[in-house]
Amino acid sequence: MSVRTRMTIFGEYRSYNEKDGERNHLKLYVFVKGISEAGEADQNRIDLIGYICKQPLYRETPLGKEITDILIAVNRKHRKSDYLPAICWYSNARLAAELPVGTKVRTMGMIQSRIYVKGDSERTAYEVSIREMEVIE
Protein backbone atom coordinates (compact mmCIF):
# COMPACT_ATOMS: atom_id res chain seq x y z
CA MET A 1 0.00 0.00 0.00
CA SER A 2 1.43 3.39 -1.01
CA VAL A 3 1.09 6.75 0.73
CA ARG A 4 -1.59 7.79 -1.80
CA THR A 5 -3.77 4.69 -1.55
CA ARG A 6 -7.48 5.50 -1.43
CA MET A 7 -9.21 4.10 1.62
CA THR A 8 -12.81 3.46 2.59
CA ILE A 9 -13.61 4.30 6.19
CA PHE A 10 -16.92 3.18 7.63
CA GLY A 11 -18.49 3.63 11.02
CA GLU A 12 -20.71 6.08 12.86
CA TYR A 13 -20.92 9.87 12.77
CA ARG A 14 -21.18 10.98 16.39
CA SER A 15 -21.71 14.20 18.28
CA TYR A 16 -20.60 15.36 21.71
CA ASN A 17 -21.40 18.56 23.58
CA GLU A 18 -18.30 20.27 24.90
CA LYS A 19 -18.63 23.02 27.50
CA ASP A 20 -16.51 26.12 27.04
CA GLY A 21 -17.28 28.31 30.02
CA GLU A 22 -20.93 29.29 29.66
CA ARG A 23 -21.27 28.02 26.08
CA ASN A 24 -21.74 24.57 24.57
CA HIS A 25 -20.03 23.50 21.36
CA LEU A 26 -21.25 20.55 19.32
CA LYS A 27 -18.22 18.47 18.35
CA LEU A 28 -18.61 15.96 15.50
CA TYR A 29 -16.50 12.81 15.12
CA VAL A 30 -16.34 9.74 12.91
CA PHE A 31 -16.27 6.61 15.08
CA VAL A 32 -14.35 4.28 12.78
CA LYS A 33 -15.42 0.63 12.75
CA GLY A 34 -13.41 -0.45 9.74
CA ILE A 35 -10.97 0.62 7.05
CA SER A 36 -10.35 -1.04 3.71
CA GLU A 37 -8.67 -0.21 0.44
CA ALA A 38 -11.09 1.69 -1.81
CA GLY A 39 -11.89 1.43 -5.48
CA GLU A 40 -11.23 4.19 -7.98
CA ALA A 41 -14.24 6.44 -7.34
CA ASP A 42 -14.12 9.21 -4.75
CA GLN A 43 -17.14 8.98 -2.50
CA ASN A 44 -18.24 10.99 0.48
CA ARG A 45 -21.51 9.41 1.54
CA ILE A 46 -23.47 9.24 4.76
CA ASP A 47 -26.80 7.48 5.32
CA LEU A 48 -28.84 8.41 8.38
CA ILE A 49 -32.11 7.31 9.93
CA GLY A 50 -33.22 9.62 12.70
CA TYR A 51 -35.70 12.16 13.98
CA ILE A 52 -36.12 15.88 13.35
CA CYS A 53 -35.35 17.24 16.83
CA LYS A 54 -35.42 21.01 16.31
CA GLN A 55 -37.78 23.25 14.37
CA PRO A 56 -36.52 23.35 10.74
CA LEU A 57 -35.24 26.75 9.57
CA TYR A 58 -36.11 27.55 5.93
CA ARG A 59 -34.46 30.42 4.04
CA GLU A 60 -33.21 31.52 0.65
CA THR A 61 -29.57 32.34 -0.03
CA PRO A 62 -28.58 35.66 -1.63
CA LEU A 63 -28.36 33.71 -4.92
CA GLY A 64 -31.96 32.49 -4.54
CA LYS A 65 -31.22 28.88 -3.51
CA GLU A 66 -33.74 27.35 -1.14
CA ILE A 67 -32.22 25.74 1.95
CA THR A 68 -33.49 24.37 5.25
CA ASP A 69 -31.33 23.72 8.29
CA ILE A 70 -32.36 20.73 10.39
CA LEU A 71 -30.98 18.86 13.38
CA ILE A 72 -31.32 15.07 13.20
CA ALA A 73 -31.23 12.89 16.32
CA VAL A 74 -29.82 9.46 15.48
CA ASN A 75 -30.34 6.87 18.21
CA ARG A 76 -27.62 4.40 19.10
CA LYS A 77 -27.14 1.72 21.74
CA HIS A 78 -27.39 2.31 25.48
CA ARG A 79 -30.05 5.01 25.20
CA LYS A 80 -27.66 7.51 23.62
CA SER A 81 -28.28 9.76 20.63
CA ASP A 82 -26.16 11.79 18.27
CA TYR A 83 -27.40 15.21 17.16
CA LEU A 84 -26.25 15.94 13.63
CA PRO A 85 -26.72 19.29 11.86
CA ALA A 86 -27.86 18.97 8.26
CA ILE A 87 -28.79 21.21 5.37
CA CYS A 88 -31.43 20.40 2.74
CA TRP A 89 -31.53 21.93 -0.73
CA TYR A 90 -34.33 22.80 -3.21
CA SER A 91 -37.25 20.31 -3.07
CA ASN A 92 -35.78 18.66 0.03
CA ALA A 93 -35.63 22.12 1.62
CA ARG A 94 -39.33 22.64 0.98
CA LEU A 95 -40.15 19.15 2.33
CA ALA A 96 -38.00 19.56 5.46
CA ALA A 97 -39.41 23.02 6.20
CA GLU A 98 -42.87 21.50 6.72
CA LEU A 99 -41.82 18.60 8.96
CA PRO A 100 -42.77 18.77 12.62
CA VAL A 101 -40.28 17.97 15.36
CA GLY A 102 -40.34 14.21 16.00
CA THR A 103 -40.71 13.17 12.35
CA LYS A 104 -38.65 10.09 11.46
CA VAL A 105 -36.58 10.51 8.29
CA ARG A 106 -34.14 8.54 6.16
CA THR A 107 -31.46 10.65 4.49
CA MET A 108 -28.53 10.20 2.14
CA GLY A 109 -25.93 12.87 1.67
CA MET A 110 -22.35 13.86 2.32
CA ILE A 111 -20.37 15.46 5.12
CA GLN A 112 -19.24 18.97 4.26
CA SER A 113 -17.60 21.95 5.88
CA ARG A 114 -18.06 25.63 5.17
CA ILE A 115 -16.53 28.85 6.44
CA TYR A 116 -18.75 31.60 7.86
CA VAL A 117 -18.22 34.83 9.77
CA LYS A 118 -19.77 35.46 13.18
CA GLY A 119 -18.99 38.80 14.75
CA ASP A 120 -15.31 39.47 14.13
CA SER A 121 -14.22 35.87 13.74
CA GLU A 122 -14.21 33.32 10.95
CA ARG A 123 -15.60 29.90 11.89
CA THR A 124 -16.06 26.50 10.28
CA ALA A 125 -19.39 24.67 10.28
CA TYR A 126 -19.59 20.92 9.70
CA GLU A 127 -22.90 19.50 8.50
CA VAL A 128 -24.54 16.80 6.43
CA SER A 129 -25.56 18.08 2.99
CA ILE A 130 -28.67 16.05 2.19
CA ARG A 131 -29.16 14.81 -1.39
CA GLU A 132 -32.14 12.53 -0.71
CA MET A 133 -34.68 12.50 2.09
CA GLU A 134 -37.84 10.57 2.81
CA VAL A 135 -40.27 10.48 5.70
CA ILE A 136 -40.56 7.09 7.41
CA GLU A 137 -43.97 6.24 8.81
Q: Could you say what each language-model-derived stretch is?
A:
Residues 1-137:
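Single-stranded nucleic acid-binding surfaces, predominantly the OB-fold ssDNA-binding core
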